[in-house]
Amino acid sequence: MTMWQFKSYFKHHLVFWKDRFLHSSEKQMQRRSILSSVVLIILSFLISFLLIISIPGGRGASFFALFTKLFLDNTNTENFLRQIAIYILAGLAFSFCMSVGIFNIGISGQMMAGAIFGFLMILKVFPSSFRPGFGGQIITVLLMVIGSVSVAVVVATLKIFFKVNEVVSAIMLNWIVVLISAYLVETYIKDNSGGTAQFFSLPLPDEFALYNFSPLTKKFGWLASLIIAFISVIIVAVVLKYTVFGHKLKSIGSSVFGSQAMGFNVRKYQFLSFIISGILSGLLATVVYTASTEKVLTFNNVGDSAISAVPATGFDGIAIGLIALNNPFRIVIVSVLIAFVNIGARPANLNPNTASLVLGIMMYFAALYNLMVYFKPWRYLVKLNIGKINLTTYETYENKLAANLEWLSFQRFLSKQKKKNDKTKFNWFDTSLFEQYAKNKQEIVQEYHHNCATNLIAWWLNAIQSGNIKPSTTFKLEFVNFKHQQKFVLNWFKNESESLRDFQSQFERINKLVEREFVK
C-alpha cells in the first residue's frame, strides 16, 4: 500500500462520514438535536446579554469579559476547571436516574453523606499513623462512594418498595443528612482555628486528598477532578448507548408499563439506577471537598453554624441535566458554559445574580427543545432559494442521497465479510466502492439541479400562457423572489457552459414576458 492509496482511502472515508451525518435518515434526529441545542444556547446568551445591558448600570463589555478575564489569573483558571468537573459529575448523577424516569433531587444529601463518612473515617477512625504513600485517594473515593450510596439506597427503597415519592423523601433526607453532618463535624472533627464565625472540619491529610493525587497532579486538584469527570462521562455514555443494561434503563424511562410487558424487572433497574447515581454523587463529594487547597468539609455555603440551606451543587446538577437533556456529552458542554458564567462573574465585575439569570434563561430555552427539534429552518431557505414548487423535488433529492448512502453502507458490510474470508487476496484499501458512490451522488445532484431549473421555467411559462400573471403587489413580490431563484439556480451551472446558456436564455425570455404583462 502506497501513501497515495492511504490518503485517497482516508479522504473517501471523511466524505462518507460527512454525508452520513448530513443526509442519512438514521441521523436525522441527531442533526436536528445538535442544531436545536446550538441555536438555543446562542439565543439564551443573546437574551442574557440584552437583559444585562438593559439593566441600569449594566455593561455589555462585562458580559464578554466572562470569557476573557477568567484566564488572566491562575487561581480563577484552576477554580474554573475544577468547577467544570463538579458540574459534570452533578449533572451525570441526576441524569442517570432520569434515564429511568426518576427525578433524583437528593444529590446534595448523597454528596454530603459521602463527604461526612469519608472525613470521619479518615480523621477519627483510622489511626493517625496510617498515611499510605500511594492509594490514599482511592480509599477516600471508596469511603465517600459508600456513604453516598447508603443514602441513595434509602431513597430507592422508599420509592420502589414503599411507593414514597422520591422528590419528597429526597428533600427530607437532604436536610437530615446536612444537619447530622453539621452535628458530627461540630462534635468530632471541627477546626476551631477559624473562630465561631466560620464552621468547617479539620483538613484532610494530603495522602488522602485529590489535591495531591500523584506527582503529576500534585497541587493540581483540578486535573485529577477533570480526569474523574471525563472518565465518568465516557463510562455513562457507553453504558447508556452500547449496552443491553443501558437500553433497558432508557426503555423503562420511556414506558414503565411497556417495559413490564416486555418482561423487564423494573424495580431492579430503578434500584440499580439509584445506586449508580449514588456512586456518581460519591465521586462528586470527593471532587468538591478534597480537590481544592482547603481540603475541608465546609458549611460556608449553607449558613455556617446556622444551617439555613442544603448545598446548591445538587440543584446545579439538576439544572445542567435538564438543559443538556440528560445527554452525557451535552452535560460537558453545558457545564463549561455554566462554569464560565459562575466563575467568570467576579473577574468580569458582574453582579453575582448574573449567573442565576443566565442559568434561568438557559433552562427556559431548554424547555423549548422539543419544539425546536421539529422546527426546520433550512426548509424555509430551500423554499426561498428554489421556490415552493420544488419542495417535492428537494424531498426526492434527499431520499435519493439517503438511498445512495444505504447502498454504500451495505456494500461496505459485504466487503468486510469478504475480508474475513480472504485476507490474503483482498485489497484492504480498495476505493472502488467510494468512487462509485461519488459517481452516483454526482448524478443525483445534477438531476436535482436540472429538475429544479426545469420546474421553475415550466411553472412560469404555464402561468404566462394561462393568463395568470396579474400586475398585483403579491405577484410582483413573487416575481422578485423568482429573480432571486434564477440567480441561485444558475449558480449551479457555472461549470456547465452549455446548460448555463440554455437556462439563462429561457429565464431571460420569461422575465421579458412577465414584465410585458405588468406593463399591460
Curated annotation (Swiss-Prot):
GO cellular component, one term: plasma membrane
Protein name according to UniProt: Uncharacterized protein MG120
Assigned keywords, A-Z: Cell membrane, Membrane, Transmembrane, Transmembrane helix
Regions crossing the membrane: 38-58, 84-104, 105-125, 138-158, 167-187, 220-240, 271-291, 318-338, 355-375
Protein topology in the membrane: Multi-pass membrane protein
InterPro entries: ABC_transp_permease
GO MF, any single term: transmembrane transporter activity
Major location category of this protein: membrane
Location relative to the cell: Cell membrane
Organism the protein comes from: Mycoplasma genitalium (strain ATCC 33530 / DSM 19775 / NCTC 10195 / G37)
One family name in Pfam for this protein: BPD_transp_2
